[in-house]
């Protein structure tokens, strides 16, 4: 009798613990708040792993393995959009795809404008997360090379985004209207930014354009009114019409291209022509004054050669930092900084 009672108490205690854990993992609406990890042995099997009754309960998901169009249908459904881009009851807010790989195959994941969209190897497809209003945080696959058109358009509460180092292109309208984004790093291998890619990302306060970037599309950063400083590096060959239209918060633009890129029209309309100062390479004032940059009243030459945006030395340590006027700086300061290192080197660093 005593053994039976002891076993009964033990079982009761175990059920109480399990019940407590279940309560901690779900909120009052039955939503699962802890991260759910799904490892796929084969692409196209996510519908089998996450049944239809559970898809609108998961808020935090990590997927490991290969995913194709069939899987992407489920991801979109969980993130609030079905195949026809109509709303669902999905509540997915946090998605980690760092150990996933997007592959070709499976069903089409979206039908829009009389067109079906399919996955392709290492590409985040067109309309992948279009109007997924609840998505707040996303880590993309490490092997991703491109982001398709309007992939995140309308994801206005997206605040955290990790872009992989191998990303080379961002498509048209990719982040259109993502006003919740405040800052993120564009990878060094990125070469092109499409038309209207960041249109209306008014929450962006800082943005570092990589050295490898060669083209910025038309209206790419239109109405990014939160941006205060911008650096256009020497590798740029073309900037489209209205690329920075309506960026009313800009106070400084640093241009490092001694050979002027091909410039579109109305690039800076809506910016503050008096408040914003443009810094151009020494000896190029006339060229820039005769170009679209003449929109601004203040164009100043500076020594732009030998600029280093990223310091990669593992051994050298920073000893001191100065402004271009020779003033000692206690911390990295927006604009051009001159930095002395312990190995004796001196480098010019663009700080945005």
Q: Where would I find each of the regions flagged by the language model?
A:
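C-terminal tail/sorting-segment detector
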Residues: 6, 336-352
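Residue-level detector of functionally pivotal "anchor" positions at catalytic/ligand-binding pockets or at interdomain
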Residues: 301-325
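Bacterial N-terminal signal peptides that target proteins for export
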Residues: 1-11
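Bacterial N-terminal signal peptides
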Residues: 9-20
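Consensus positions within tandem repeat domains that build extended binding/scaffold surfaces
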Residues: 125-128, 148-153, 171-176, 194-199, ...
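Structural signature of tandem-repeat unit edges
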Residues: 31-41, 59-67, 87-122, 133-146, ...
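Short, surface-exposed loop/turn motifs with a glycine/proline- and acidic-biased composition
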Residues: 323-343
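Terminal processing/anchoring signals of secreted or surface-associated proteins
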Residues: 61, 288, 306-310, 326, ...
